Amino acid sequence: MSKSENLYSAARELIPGGVNSPVRAFTGVGGTPLFIEKADGAYLYDVDGKAYIDYVGSWGPMVLGHNHPAIRNAVIEAAERGLSFGAPTEMEVKMAQLVTELVPTMDMVRMVNSGTEATMSAIRLARGFTGRDKIIKFEGCYHGHADCLLVKAGSGALTLGQPNSPGVPADFAKHTLTCTYNDLASVRAAFEQYPQEIACIIVEPVAGNMNCVPPLPEFLPGLRALCDEFGALLIIDEVMTGFRVALAGAQDYYGVEPDLTCLGKIIGGGMPVGAFGGRRDVMDALAPTGPVYQAGTLSGNPIAMAAGFACLNEVAQPGVHETLDELTSRLAEGLLEAAEEAGIPLVVNHVGGMFGIFFTDAESVTCYQDVMACDVERFKRFFHMMLDEGVYLAPSAFEAGFMSVAHSMEDINNTIDAARRVFAKL
């Protein structure tokens, strides 16, 4: 047995499923998950000594690559001053200033510890601000594991085939209205059925938890217009897309202005950080200035703030997003060319530093139904054959891939060459 296999066997006796987040268990592809010893740049190194070109990037945060010196040094320096104070720090103020400068729609921001905390808090705030209970989300979109959001969810919920989680009371779920991504008619129908009851829409601007599904041109502006028409708030969940699709996020890339924005992943530079923010009048409803309660022992943790501040300063440098786009575009083009040579039907969606691989005869993939019609079994074989080639993709047909600026064009070309060999045998 490999060392990964031995560790996985031991882990399953101690940790449910052997992992601390379900998708890591390789449930969606079969086999034994890799146990990682270290990472550097664009590469992961497992406990058995094998190196992999990494397109998971810790599920999105590692936009600069692993073990970036600026982030590492910031963490070391901050740790020397103490790990947690439970009191305000200067770095929290500097971090808030930077985030609100980079994302102009955020007049104010509240730091939390995860993307899930960000989305659940933003929804509570929207409900408190509007005095309404119902929310709209979209099939296949994932906004963390809060009860009200585990209804027809994406990410690991899709991987496990359980988009509606046991343990979520029907009384909670009844306030969550699920519409079809990229289908404005379904959203209007929900508003017309409950014109005075919907507090907010929460949406991934690029649906990255049913692989990678970009919005149709009219979709996000249409959501903004419907929220304005019916008095609801628009929450854009940029946990995945923030600082990756563009410096000011997908909202800037697609030209839509939300009332609230949720952030995570990149904002922490690899540390556990989330944030939510937006219009000043809405954020003023948050405790301690307003009645909507939210709190966290480790929110604004000095180590995490130092990591995030260093990361965002690097991400804001000229050329970062152009590099991400160039590398991702080259990978997408190369995969499509290699698949066509082998007669393999393939769609590759990509936006900025995100991409999605779909084995399908369809010309495009634009919604949940399109994603579910793809050939998952072929993806499973592709995943394991690419892993054997030293390429680490997301171990699920329903998760996006992530590029970093640490990837080189040589890494991209080596990945395409590996895919060409795999397609020939697939």
Curated annotation (Swiss-Prot):
It comes from Escherichia coli O139:H28 (strain E24377A / ETEC). Belongs to the class-III pyridoxal-phosphate-dependent aminotransferase family. HemL subfamily. It catalyses: (S)-4-amino-5-oxopentanoate = 5-aminolevulinate. GO terms for biological process: protoporphyrinogen IX biosynthetic process. PROSITE patterns: AA_TRANSFER_CLASS_3. Its cofactor is pyridoxal 5'-phosphate. It is found in: Cytoplasm. InterPro entries: 4pyrrol_synth_GluAld_NH2Trfase, Aminotrans_3, Aminotrans_3_PPA_site, PyrdxlP-dep_Trfase, PyrdxlP-dep_Trfase_major, PyrdxlP-dep_Trfase_small. GO terms for molecular function: glutamate-1-semialdehyde 2,1-aminomutase activity; pyridoxal phosphate binding; transaminase activity. Its main location: cytoplasm. The lineage of its organism: Bacteria, Pseudomonadati, Pseudomonadota, Gammaproteobacteria, Enterobacterales. Homodimer. Keywords: Cytoplasm, Isomerase, Porphyrin biosynthesis, Pyridoxal phosphate. It is an enzyme of class 5 (isomerase). The modification N6-(pyridoxal phosphate)lysine is found at K265. Pathway: Porphyrin-containing compound metabolism; protoporphyrin-IX biosynthesis; 5-aminolevulinate from L-glutamyl-tRNA(Glu): step 2/2. This is Glutamate-1-semialdehyde 2,1-aminomutase. Its EC number is 5.4.3.8. It comes from the Bacteria. GO terms for cellular component: cytoplasm.
